[in-house]
C-alpha cells in the first residue's frame, strides 16, 4: 500500500505541505532510540534553548545521520527518499541533512514562524522536508504551514529559534 498518492502529490505541489499520517509508523520506535542516543551524546552543532522561566528546554541538533545508527538506517532503508522523489516529481532524491527538535510539553519557548529554505543555503525548487512527530501532540503543539507560501519567491531572513538573527 502506498501512503502518498497522486492527490497528495498534487496538493503538495499546490500547497507546499501535506499531512501523511502513519507514513513512517514502523520507524517511530527506532527513531526514538536514536533521539535518546543523540540527547545523551549531542554533537558540536547542538543548540538547546533553556527558558529563563524554568520551563522545559528546547533541544535541537542536526547532521547526525552518520553517527546515530538509527537515523542512518531510516535514511537509507525507509521510503523517505522514494516519497521525496514522488513529491518533487523527480526520478531520484538526495538527502541533505537531519534536524532533530525536541520540545518537551510545557516549554515556554515558541518556535518562530519561518521558512525552511533560507536555512539551507541552497538554490532550487525541488526540495522537501519531512516533519516526523515521534510523540503524540496536541493540535496546539503541532506544525502549522501557510498553504501556497512556497510559490511567492519571497524569502525571509532566518532566525535562531530564540528569535535572534541567524546571520
Predicted regions and their residues:
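Short loop segments at secondary-structure junctions
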Residues: 22-23, 105, 134-138, 149-150
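Short, conserved beta-strand element in jelly-roll/cupin
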Residues: 121-138
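Short, structured patches in soluble enzyme cores that scaffold and shape functional sites
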Residues: 99, 115, 132-136, 147
Amino acid at each position: 500500500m502506498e501512503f502518498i498518492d497522486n492527490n497528495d502529490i498534487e496538493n503538495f505541489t499546490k500547497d507546499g505541505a501535506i499531512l501523511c499520517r502513519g507514513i513512517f509508523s514502523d520507524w517511530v520506535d527506532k527513531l526514538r532510540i536514536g533521539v535518546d542516543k543523540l540527547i545523551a551524546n549531542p554533537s558540536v552543532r547542538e543548540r538547546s534553548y533553556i527558558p529563563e522561566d524554568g520551563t522545559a528546554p528546547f533541544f535541537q541538533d542536526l547532521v547526525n545521520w552518520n553517527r546515530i545508527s538509527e537515523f542512518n538506517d531510516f535514511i537509507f532503508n525507509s521510503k523517505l527518499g522514494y516519497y521525496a522523489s514522488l513529491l518533487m516529481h523527480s526520478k531520484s532524491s538526495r538527502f541533505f541533512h537531519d534536524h532533530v527538535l525536541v520540545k518537551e510539553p510545557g516549554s515556554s519557548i515558541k518556535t518562530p514562524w519561518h521558512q525552511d529554505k533560507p536555512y539551507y543555503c541552497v538554490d532550487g525548487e525541488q526540495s522537501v522536508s519531512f516533519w516526523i512527530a515521534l510523540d503524540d501532540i496536541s493540535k496546539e503543539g503541532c506544525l502549522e504551514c501557510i498553504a501556497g507560501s512556497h510559490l511567492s519567491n519571497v524569502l525571509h531572513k532566518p532566525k535562531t529559534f530564540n528569535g535572534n538573527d541567524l546571520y
